[in-house]
């Protein structure tokens, strides 16, 4: 790996220039001066009169301190000092001629004085910002107050200051005077040149938040372990390899970020009450950790992205309270179902840019899951879809699951558990989300006693409580039954016995009747009705006594026959144990054969009903959310999910068939009252699935230009035979074992000298194209990487800047190199002509 560094880690980073509009056509020639200096004959810096397409030269930023400032945007670039309109070259008078505008040019000393004046601390302020000020030490002006210091006579205790933010400076140490800020709660010294934390910092008993990212720590600063009051600690982008044992003593710590360090494993000394843990961009290989098990009671957010994890250990099943799990850019091939199924609190699951080709069926049991990121994996069925398509419209989560049989089994189990709860509650109001992931709806009605056998869907005389789930679920009941019973739901337990005879094939529009224990029955319609359903209607009062007598006689007959058979079997068992065993085997084989035959018959019926249902569904769309006579009632089903809405429509079913569907933004329960019968339909909660991958643009043969995410998409890069990656930014290689990298550490600012790297980058690009292919990228794929691409085309094709620019923008229309880079490309054009 080749690594180039232009600025030291703690050097000042100038302000970010404004990003302009996309070029379309010839680049304006007046932007470039003949000598490449970026100035015109009028002595003013080059800029266009269109504010949306300027690249202004950064100026030193300023900031103010006031009591109403917050630390929510402390790392952002502050507003630069301006003097008039910097982008205006001249103004037109009434005659239409252009006059040069006068612009006062501040000297360096004047700028510094103005900055220092603007940074004067206002006595009594609770926050002080001093970002990008090139401070070499903490300014002493903040030590003002009513109580003078005995140790430092010229300074005073400042009891008002709560937040001190001095990011992106050149501070090398924390002074002892920091003790004069006894009520300081937030201290941020990110992007400085610190290498140690002094012990006296622990004297700040109110300090809760400490941010020391992007400094020069080669090991974890031990004195941090003595600051017991810390609740937030950030040490991103240092060279920390491990954590000390005493770190576990920070019992108040809830938010810890060790992003972009050199950790080889998940530390064992994590404090007990961590809620948010960021270990991304390290070198972690093993996902097993004792500390994760220990803190699982409090952990809600875990980031393990950009590591080298290949296997998710079974111990990760302890993450029962995690709501956000980030596993981007690892080497994961399989997600164990036993692990995934235990993440019941999960709301956001990020798995982009791994090697996953299948999701476990257990993912459908995660009721709180709302966002699933699957970009850049190996799901074959969606590779040919354009990335512009909406994933939430095209695909459902079930399509990413290969084990459909297990999927149906899990859905059935979940629905039966819900049905059992509804029976136990003996409620007439549906408040539970029924999983409706499969195709055909089934209606189950509770709170009734018996069921008549009919050839059509019965209409009850009283309002019933119908709950929709899918007909495919019933297949699993048949597959797992014996000759006499099958498992569903009862009032006392989770089992309901379905008698074998209900599954015998019926002809001539006869239905299969199933009698449930206690007061609930299920009827499976097997004729060619318009909609396959399982329904439990209320029986007529006139038939009640006769049906009860018939049931009693039938039960007595079964009981007598069973007793006789049991007595005979007991005698045979006592006489010949061997015969008993053989008989059991034969009996089980016969039962298995019958069940297999019944399973095939029912599967064939289900298949035909699904086809018919889909045809009917296309002709008559579902109930609209916003049509006539709606009455909405909010019912909470899950604590972390949006509440479903119940919409009651008292209207004829013929009218419902003609209504157009509307897009539903939340889970929905639709109750339709028609002829004194209530039908309830519950739609599954919406899930946002990201599957589209961002891919780079092909500029010329075997040369791709893109953003940083394109460099993350290793599956696409491997599929397109990319072997080399040129990174024109300060990003460490993501996959050094898969690709060869050249890192050019340079900022996207006008003053940066990218010209000096043209020769080295061109050689690397040539090598990559010879080996298979090369990707050139920066953060956005707009300025730095575009400049490198243009320079290579100028050299390789022996063309001028404008022609190389046109070739590049044709392949990637969003490119926009900054003004300084454009001037250097113009200079490169002159050098090539020599």
Swiss-Prot record:
Residues 555-615 form a coiled coil. The active site is at residue 778. The keyword Repeat applies. Residues 695-834 form the Tyrosine-protein phosphatase domain. The keyword Magnesium does not apply. Probable phosphatase with dual specificity toward Ser/Thr and Tyr-containing proteins. Dephosphorylates pNPP, in vitro. Essential for proper regulation of erkB (erk2) and optimal motility during development. This is MAP kinase phosphatase with leucine-rich repeats protein 1. It comes from Dictyostelium discoideum (Social amoeba). The gene is mpl1.
